[in-house]
């Protein structure tokens, strides 16, 4: 199934050509979707997705914009390449080889971890059509097949996946929240219950993980019950 | 509890002063946090939060930047006003007056609906400290008190709220997703299971609501069981 894929491979190499330029004889690294994806992720990581422009991307790749347009026709295509590459890093390896709950657990944690590193892409991926995003479609196919085999009602499989993803995207943001996000400042006296709960919650060393595990296990348990 | 609050009221009036300007005698509407909040939300809705600048906000309010700085010291303050105002629109009215499951259900649906109208603020609210955001703190206090009264383990109350919020924020994006988000494009043949599940799911008229209900009820059911 993988052989025909030409983009979104798991580990795009760094843009070697940029550092291998030889004096007097410019070395033109072959421009392909892997290089475009790497450069786009680099720019998005630095400037957010609003900071990604076709002109900026061409400059980063040291090519003329026209060369870039031979591979991607618009920023939307570039975002889809970036999104599809990130999805290729999500672990779906246990689906079909372990009970679906266990596979879904590994999938969801790795999905959250990948997007916690790229939260600026969440507003994009959450609403970007998957058309021509082969790794993303493959992930959906793998998860769907496993959910169907487990006995999920057919008409609720896509909704279940979306519910997982919504929780995963929101939780990815939470990973990046500052430690003091719940500090109450000057209005502290009016929130005695909240303050007490915050204090009690300090036993959880990694609060984002505690909240994620709680919600994820809730989703898995409820879906497991719906199969009975 | 509400009397001392001076910002983030539930319904900020439109900036009347701007249309009541009288010829030859400029009418200066009183600049307060309510007007600043309205103007900020208007700009954010139009340009996203990256498009909000202190200079642009002063211009929108027809005041000198120095006048603006008398009320807010930085863009971060403005975002907090906007965030706190949105939170004031979330329905917490049933907490303490109905079973916690029912109150949480109304709270979560209204919370999702408010942020589905303002998804560009999600990356902000998800990581913005609540210091000096009185409506936000009041919401947390109300929910915490109800969860504690229901018998939630004290050390897991904040994590439970965060799990709900993560799901709510991710689901707010899903409300804005285009209908064709899962269209497979040219690679359609490699995803037979996913295509079949998509087709079966078309019985759900409002897919974002189906997914939200599924996940929300899962969270509520699992948390309810943890109380037994």
Language-model features and meaning:
Chain A
Residues 35, 39-77, 81:
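Helix-turn-helix
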């Amino acid at each position: 199934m993988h052989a025909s894929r030409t983009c979104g491979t798991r580990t795009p190499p760094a843009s070697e050509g940029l550092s291998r330029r030889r004096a007097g004889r410019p070395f033109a690294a072959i421009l392909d979707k892997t290089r475009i994806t790497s450069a786009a992720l680099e720019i998005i990581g630095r400037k957010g997705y609003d900071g990604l422009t076709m002109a900026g991307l061409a400059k980063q790749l040291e090519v003329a914009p026209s060369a870039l347009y031979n591979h991607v026709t618009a920023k939307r295509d570039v975002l889809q390449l970036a999104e599809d590459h990130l999805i290729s890093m999500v672990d779906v390896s246990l689906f079909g080889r372990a009970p679906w709950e266990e596979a879904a657990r590994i999938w969801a944690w790795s999905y959250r971890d990948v997007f916690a590193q790229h939260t600026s892409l969440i507003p994009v991926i959450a609403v970007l059509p998957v058309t021509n995003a082969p790794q993303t479609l493959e992930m959906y196919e793998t998860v769907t097949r496993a959910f169907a085999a487990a006995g999920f009602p057919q008409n609720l499989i896509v909704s279940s996946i979306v519910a997982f993803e919504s929780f995963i995207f929101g939780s990815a943001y939470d990973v990046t929240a500052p430690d003091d996000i719940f500090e109450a400042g000057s209005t502290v006296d009016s929130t005695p219950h909240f303050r007490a709960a915050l204090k009690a919650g300090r036993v959880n060393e990694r609060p984002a993980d505690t909240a994620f595990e709680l919600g994820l296990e809730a989703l898995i348990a409820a879906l497991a019950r719906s199969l009975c």
